Amino acid sequence: ARDAYIAKPHNCVYECYNPKGSYCNDLCTENGAESGYCQILGKYGNACWCIQLPDNVPIRIPGKCH
């Protein structure tokens, strides 16, 4: 497991807008992570960051989102 931006197919992040909201935590835990939160103005803009996301779940890697 690792801490990372969870990715949709095609290497795109899940955008989020409310750092206090539960959207990212729900998304991350549904995918097996310990927790997650909305990182505002991070490397990929406002995106969901997951803590201890299982290795089989795709994460945002360098390169284009397409």
UniProtKB/Swiss-Prot annotation:
Result for mutant: A4G: In msBeM9; gain of activity on rNav1.2/SCN2A (reduces peak current and inhibits inactivation), important decrease or loss in activity on rNav1.4/SCN4A, hNav1.5/SCN5A and BgNav1, and no change in activity on mNav1.6/SCN8A
Source taxon at top rank: Eukaryota
Cellular location(s): Secreted
InterPro entries (alphabetical): LCN-type_CS_alpha_beta_dom, Scorpion_toxin-like, Scorpion_toxin-like_sf, Scorpion_toxinL, Scorpion_toxinL/defensin
Keyword terms of this UniProt record: Disulfide bond, Ion channel impairing toxin, Neurotoxin, Secreted, Toxin, Voltage-gated sodium channel impairing toxin
Tissue-level expression: Expressed by the venom gland.
Signal peptide: none
A cellular component annotation (GO) from this entry: extracellular region
PROSITE patterns: LCN_CSAB (PS51863)
GO biological process: defense response
Annotated ranges, domain LCN-type CS-alpha/beta: 2-66
Pfam family, one: Toxin_3
Coiled-coil parts of chain: none
GO molecular function: sodium channel inhibitor activity; toxin activity
Positions of the record's site feature: Key residue for activity on mammalian channels, it controls twisting and flexibility of active residues at the C-terminus: R60
Result of changing V13T: In msBeM9; gain of activity on rNav1.2/SCN2A (reduces peak current and inhibits inactivation), important decrease or loss in activity on rNav1.4/SCN4A, hNav1.5/SCN5A and BgNav1, and no change in activity on mNav1.6/SCN8A
Disulfide bonds: C12-C65, C16-C38, C24-C48, C28-C50
SUPFAM superfamilies, A to Z: Scorpion toxin-like
Function: Alpha toxins bind voltage-independently at site-3 of sodium channels (Nav) and inhibit the inactivation of the activated channels, thereby blocking neuronal transmission. This toxin is active on both mammals and insects, since it inhibits inactivation of rNav1.4/SCN4A, hNav1.5/SCN5A, mNav1.6/SCN8A and insect BgNav1 and DmNav1 channels. In vivo, it shows paralytic activity in mice.
Protein family membership: Belongs to the long (4 C-C) scorpion toxin superfamily. Sodium channel inhibitor family. Alpha subfamily.
Misc remark: Negative results: does not show activity on rNav1.2/SCN2A (neither peak current reduction, nor inhibition of inactivation).
Domain notes: Has the structural arrangement of an alpha-helix connected to antiparallel beta-sheets by disulfide bonds (CS-alpha/beta).
Protein name per Swiss-Prot or TrEMBL: Alpha-like toxin BeM9
Organism listed in the record: Mesobuthus eupeus (Lesser Asian scorpion)
